[in-house]
A protein has these predicted regions:
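Signature of the chorismate-utilizing enzyme
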Residues: 1-138
Length: 138
């Protein structure tokens, strides 16, 4: 369950910079920025919902190096909440009979997802105003 807070704000770039800086204070964070402005003439607006989606802090995590997609499915079905994470290149070895063991330099698992405590959604409403929604886990 999440409690929602909405704010009308100005200066989207300033807010995005603050979100990125704030992400450094958490062990678990993810900041996703839209490239809609780069492709505005070519991309229908209905395909773009948010200019920025960010996740901070962690309620639960999933790390896997085997049977990863099955574990992700169970994790998702149990949590029924926002998930942020990453997939490694070597995860392909679980899909086909392939073998590689690429060193990523940070010893990340093949699959990693977390349920964030906070989700921030930033949407451009018009040229002068933006809407920031904060979804806090309760």
């Amino acid at each position: 369950m999440r409690k929602s807070y909405k704010y009308n704000i100005k200066c989207e770039k300033k807010i995005i910079n603050q979100i990125i800086l704030k992400s450094k204070n958490y062990s678990f964070s993810s900041v996703l920025l839209s490239n809609y402005n780069l492709h505005k003439p070519n991309m229908p607006e209905k395909y773009i919902s948010y200019d920025c989606i960010a996740a901070f802090d962690m309620i639960d995590t999933l790390l896997s190096n085997s049977n990863s997609f099955e574990k992700l499915s169970v994790f998702h079905n149990n949590k029924k909440d926002w998930l942020f994470g990453s997939l490694s290149y070597d995860l392909k070895n679980e899909l086909e009979q392939l073998s590689s063991n690429n060193n990523d330099g940070v010893f990340a698992p093949d699959l990693f997802f977390f349920v964030p405590k906070y989700v921030l959604l930033l949407k451009d409403k018009n040229d002068a105003e933006n809407e920031l929604s904060i979804l806090k886990a309760t």
